[in-house]
């Protein structure tokens, strides 16, 4: 529980400070990337765990999602993370402007192909928390 909470908190903090399509790096100026994310934007934190012995296979089919999702103009933020202590335990952090954009993303063929492979590779499917981005009062 505590590890999951730490992972989710790390995902949120990391995503909040990085808004480029490349690797992880600090923002160029204070708050520049935040202007792209509106109050109430549709945020998702998802979790998937590999079946024992399937960690490398799940990682191999999941890594290509980074470039594909970040290439979607409707995607505002996408981070894939793996638990350092439990290889094969992945946390996804995604932000879209609204639920319709997220559902359109889920309908993409590459996402559907990924979901179709999960029964052989993942324990219990994907656990998803659907959230909204909050901004300070006045924003």
Where are these regions (language model features)?
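Short amphipathic alpha-helical segments
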Residues: 54-76, 110-113
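Bacterial N-terminal signal peptides that target proteins for export
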Residues: 1-11
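Short, well-ordered beta-strand segments in beta-rich or mixed alpha/beta enzyme
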Residues: 41-49, 79-106, 132
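Bacterial N-terminal signal peptides
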Residues: 9-21
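N-terminal targeting signals for Sec/Tat export/insertion, comprising classic cleavable signal peptides
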Residues: 34-60, 64
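Glycine-rich beta-strand-turn "strand-cap" elements at beta-sheet edges
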Residues: 24-42, 80-86, 115-139
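Short, glycine- and small/hydrophobic-rich beta-strand elements in well-ordered beta-sheets
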Residues: 33, 66-91
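Sec/Tat-exported extracytoplasmic proteins
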Residues: 52, 66-73, 106, 118, ...
């Amino acid at each position: 529980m505590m590890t999951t909470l730490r992972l989710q908190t790390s995902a949120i903090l990391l995503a909040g400070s990085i808004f480029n399509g490349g690797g992880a790096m600090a923002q160029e100026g204070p708050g520049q990337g935040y202007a792209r994310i509106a109050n109430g934007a549709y945020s998702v934190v998802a979790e998937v765990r590999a079946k024992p012995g399937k960690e490398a296979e799940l990682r191999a089919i999941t890594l290509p999602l980074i470039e594909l999702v970040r290439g979607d103009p409707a995607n505002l933020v996408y981070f894939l993370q793996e638990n350092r202590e439990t290889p094969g335990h992945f946390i996804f952090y995604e932000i879209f402007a609204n639920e319709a954009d997220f559902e359109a993303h889920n309908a993409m063929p590459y996402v559907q192909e990924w979901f179709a492979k999960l029964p052989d590779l993942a324990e219990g499917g994907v656990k998803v928390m659907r959230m909204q981005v909050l901004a300070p009062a006045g924003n």
